[in-house]
């Protein structure tokens, strides 16, 4: 009997396979539940982080997880953005294309990026090979363009200098200066003359100068007398005439000088009155005429007037019939009497003059 009781106890104490399987399944389900709870928590954290900000202080766990994710993202972006800068020296592509190694093969071949039919301007062309840092030539296109402009400007400056040198001997002015005599009203021309200077009373070889009295409609009304220089004309105005129009005549002399020499109003002019003629030897002084005129400004140039050719603008022909005895049938009258005049009711008969 005792043996049977022990056996029954052993049977009771031994776990059944079904019960053990159920317990194991329960444990696995708990573990999965626990593990699933962590995943759900992490997803909840991510959802909460994506939600808009709320008032109050965040839990510490959420802050720690957010900082860790941002640090990971920053490190990944820094690793991706890291770049290597390579600076190549300036090398002529033509030299590189000619290089060969020991086996006779070309070390470097420049690919043709453009077709032979393409035409590009200087601005569109790149300054370097492959349109990068390596230039096609040692000198860039802009430098060549600027050098051409500099040489062109230098040539223009040299031409202007040469023109200035030649203009000292001969110059053409597009001017229409006309001189009219105050006494006779006739037109006077700038030509050499055998007359003596009115101020120093000596002959001269240059073109005569005049003292303008009035300027009107582009014409200078001058005194008929001639002067060897503008200095003598100003001296005659200051020392001999001595009237209220001294400044007017002087300003007209300056204006005439600028117009004859093609000067602008801003350019300075050094025109002074000639010294008194009593300094000359002929007037009892000690100075000869050469020293007296040494500092004068003379018109040592000959002015030739070139008249442009005259072209007819247009010719109009007017036809007029001079034959008045012909028929007047072709004429159209503006006023025409439709009714004939009454013979018995004229003005004379009505007034009674016929009686």
From Swiss-Prot:
Residues 1-61 are annotated as: Disordered. It comes from the Viruses. Residues 18-37 have a biased composition (Polar residues). This is Uncharacterized protein R450.
